[in-house]
Design a protein with these regions (language model features):
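N-terminal glycine-rich phosphate-binding loop and ensuing alpha1 helix
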Residues: 2-52
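Conserved alpha/beta core of the MobA/IspD/sugar-nucleotide pyrophosphorylase nucleotidyltransferase superfamily
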Residues: 2, 91, 169-250
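Residues that recognize and position ribonucleotide moieties
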Residues: 17, 95, 102, 144, ...
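Conserved core of the sugar-phosphate nucleotidyltransferase
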Residues: 104-194
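Short, high-confidence coil segments that cap the C-terminus of an alpha-helix
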Residues: 46, 91, 119-122, 212
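A conserved hydrophobic position in a structured secondary element of the catalytic/binding core
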Residues: 53-54, 104, 180, 227
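Short phosphate-binding loop-to-helix
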Residues: 50, 56-114
Length: 250
């Protein structure tokens, strides 16, 4: 088996509490999921791009965009849905691509895929960007603190680290992309949800609670998530900016 076989999987469920049918929402004239598929294809490092979904309409849109759709059942989190999609597939590494970021930078996807390829003993990786003091008190911005080797100690919606003696560079903002070795992803999906995961509403805390090393890399670029319909204009602006830098937003 090719040691470098990497898959990109986009979890895309229909029933979003704040934005039902979000993966099919028109962004610059196309379904949002089509843009995410296009970004993953542009990364150029995946043997295949899959969309894991519970809805046939999303599956059709994914196929039209060039992805392989996989119908999954009810899942606890995006990573659990990704695990269900790849369980029986030939893969070494898997990148969970957020389905609500139509302008996700392809270089961020390459960062994760290349790190896992170069470090087969690293079970899981994610990304972060420098944060600001204002981010600390915003519960919609997830913060991460790491050890000296760049592995996550904790993620929280609360202020971490608490700024009693603030220092430059301590505030880091999590970028919600995840890469896994396949075996690590299947182990993650086999574990029960933990109290920390439920308390914060953050699936990655399941990995930390079970002692899995989660490497945090510096993201190459920021992205824009679509959480509610009001976020669509920002996403369209991000797509236009991506196109102006030489990416495709068609």
């Amino acid at each position: 088996m090719d040691r470098n076989r990497a898959l990109a999987v986009i979890p895309a469920r229909y029933a979003s509490t704040r934005f039902p049918g979000k993966p099919l929402a028109p962004i610059a004239g196309r379904p949002m999921v089509a843009h995410v598929v296009e970004r993953a294809l542009e990364a150029g490092c995946f043997a295949a791009v899959l969309v894991a979904t519970d809805d046939e309409r999303i599956a059709r849109a994914a196929a039209d965009a060039g992805a392989r759709p996989v119908i999954t059942g009810e899942c606890r989190s995006g990573s659990d849905r990704v695990a269900a999609a790849i369980r029986d597939l030939d893969a070494d590494t898997v990148v969970n691509v957020q389905g609500d970021e139509p302008a996700v930078p392809p270089q961020n996807l390459r960062l994760l895929a290349e790190f896992l390829r170069a470090h087969p003993d690293a079970p899981m990786a994610t990304l972060a960007l420098p944060g600001s003091p204002a981010d600390l008190d915003n519960p919609n911005i997830v913060k991460v603190v790491c050890d000296l080797a760049g592995r996550a100690l904790y993620f929280s919606r609360a202020a971490i680290p608490y700024p009693r003696n603030p220092a430059p560079g301590l505030v880091r903002r999590h970028v919600g992309l995840y890469g896994f070795q396949k075996a690590a992803l299947l182990a993650f999906a086999s574990w029960e949800e933990t109290d920390l995961e439920r308390a914060e509403g953050l699936e990655q805390l399941r990995a930390l609670a079970h002692g899995m090393a989660l490497h945090v890399l510096d993201a190459a670029a920021d992205s824009v998530a679509v959480d509610v319909p009001a976020d669509v204009p920002r996403a369209e602006a991000a797509l236009a900016a991506l196109a102006s830098r030489g990416g495709s937003a068609s």
